[in-house]
Structures are given as C-alpha cells and as structure tokens.
UniProtKB/Swiss-Prot annotation:
Pfam families: Adeno_E1B_19K. It comes from the Viruses. Belongs to the adenoviridae E1B 19 kDa protein family. This is E1B protein, small T-antigen. The keyword Phosphoprotein does not apply. The keyword Transport does not apply. Residues 153-175 are annotated as: Disordered. It comes from Murine adenovirus A serotype 1 (MAdV-1). InterPro entries: Adenovir_t-Ag_E1B_19kDa.
Amino acid sequence: MLPVYPFLAPVFDTFESTRALFLEATLSLQEPWWFRLLSFFRSPRYTGLADVVRAIACEREADFTAITPSSLIEDIAEGRFVMLVGLMEYLRFDTAGQGIVSFAFLSYLIDRVTKQSPLAHFTVVEVVSLVVWRTVKLSRRRERRWVSQLSTLAEEDEDEEGTTLTTEAEQESSA
C-alpha cells in the first residue's frame, strides 16, 4: 500500500468514491473518451481540471490512446503536460486498484498547470519514484503469489504421485 500522507487522505477518499462511477460512465458512452472526461468533471469541484483537459485536447491533435505508462514518465521528465489526458485514459483501464498512483501523477500535473495541487511540493523525481516503488511492490506481490501457486501445484503433484505409487504397490501385493 502506498504511504498515504494525512493531507492527501481527503483527496484519495473523494477520488475513490467517484472512481467507479467514472469508469462506468466512460465505458458506457460512445463519444471520445476525453469528451466524456470533460462531462464527468463539469461539477464545480472539478471545473479547473476540465478547463485544463479541454485546453490540452484542443491544443494537441494526437492519438491519446497510444500513450502508455512508460511514455507518461518520459513526458513528465520532458514537461509535456499533454500526458494529463493520457493519464486519464490510463486510469480508465486501471482495473488492478492502482488508482492512487495514477492520481498522484494527475495531481502533480494539475499542480504544474494550475498551481493548486495537494502534491505541490512533490518533484518529478519524487512522483516517478512513487510509481516505481508501487510497481516494484506490485511485482513482488505477484511474484510471491506465483511462488505460492507453484508450491501448491507442486504439493498437489506430489500427493497424486504418492497416491499412484501406493495404488500400484497395492495391486502388485494383491496379485
């Protein structure tokens, strides 16, 4: 679990409570996803973010769906804020519960564009480090799960082999 700093807790709570609704809305409509994003953030609380996304979407004609997490890190390093839109696309496909990391990226970018982010004191390196840390942690968790599954399978195989050997021995003794 990412370390949640006290001043970020309300942000994450709000984000998590609206995330499911956002995912459902984006997947059910046929308009371009960034247009759906604008619709989602039309509430007064998110007006500033909608303006930022609208400006980026109008300013840059690009295939936003081609943006990947690795390209996001490159964009952060080079200061290309168009990746804010890519982040929201990444969030849309984020079904593994990693929204906090994505939202940390998003908050950082909003700060760079609007100077109103709760992550105002985070640097590029710190934000990228958060993501790398989270990715490594998830990888280790997956690795542990795989090892556990493999050991379970190995135990089942041993049990089956033992049963087979016992059955063969019983058959020989009865013959």
